[in-house]
A protein has these predicted regions:
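N-terminal glycine-rich FAD/FM-binding segment characteristic of electron-transfer flavoproteins
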Residues: 2-224
């Protein structure tokens, strides 16, 4: 009988302004103060994929986000979906980070979590749409990358990923550990169940700062 590979999955999620509560100043800039927040929509698909792999093969799913203290809100929602662990990366030093500095900090968090099989990102954030954070993080980790994945299967110690494009599809096999970004087509995110909400309320949120991660301050925030 083929051995079942239990999955240790990290899902990186982002807090974005609630699109139903967007306000602009007189210069057309987004007013973030007092605006509600939500999980970046495609990051819910990333969470669902991680949870589905855990449910099928066993293992754990850790949700990670970088941001101010209020970013705990999206981590609570990840716990309510069924994640096993939630980690907030928060430090004033991280403020003003571009995708390069963000990817560096996220890679340090992945290393601190340790010995993971798969890191999953949504393919882009609705408030920026750079689609760079996942690839940059993979680069810092020195791991293979699959982008815009819309279907995935586990094959022993490897994953088989499919991505679609105009006129066809592409399938590739990648050894684990690996980093992938996913599109909304990969699945339909589950709803929060009362049981998962009750369970999630019992779980704490771990907070790591720059020193906890062992980051080089020169590579973080505006300096990075």
């Amino acid at each position: 009988m083929k051995e079942v590979h239990k999955m240790k999955v990290i899902v990186f999620i982002k807090q974005i302004p609630d699109s139903s509560d967007v306000k602009l100043d007189e210069n057309g800039n987004l007013i973030r103060s007092g605006v509600g927040t939500m999980i970046n929509p495609v990051d819910k698909n990333a969470l669902e994929l991680g949870l589905a792999l855990r449910d099928r093969f066993g293992g754990t799913v850790s949700a990670v986000t970088m941001g101010p203290p209020q970013a705990k809100d999206v981590l609570k929602r990840a716990l309510f979906m069924g994640c096993d662990k939630a980690v907030l990366l928060s430090d004033r030093i991280f403020g003003g980070a571009d995708t390069l500095a963000t990817g560096y900090v996220l890679s340090m968090a992945a290393k601190k979590l340790g010995d993971f099989d798969l890191a999953i990102f949504g393919n882009k954030a609705s408030d920026a749409e750079t689609a760079q954070t996942g690839p940059v993080t993979a680069g810092f980790l020195g791991l293979p990358l699959g982008t815009s994945v819309d279907a995935l299967e586990l094959d022993g110690n490897a994953i088989v990923c499919r991505r679609s494009f105009t006129g066809g599809t592409e399938t590739s096999k990648t050894a684990l550990p690996a980093v992938i970004t996913v599109t909304p087509a990969v699945n339909t995110p589950r709803f929060m169940t009362p049981a998962n909400v009750i369970d999630g309320l019992k779980k704490g949120i771990t907070v790591w700062n720059c020193a906890d991660l062992g980051c080089d301050e020169a590579k973080c925030g505006v300096k990075g």
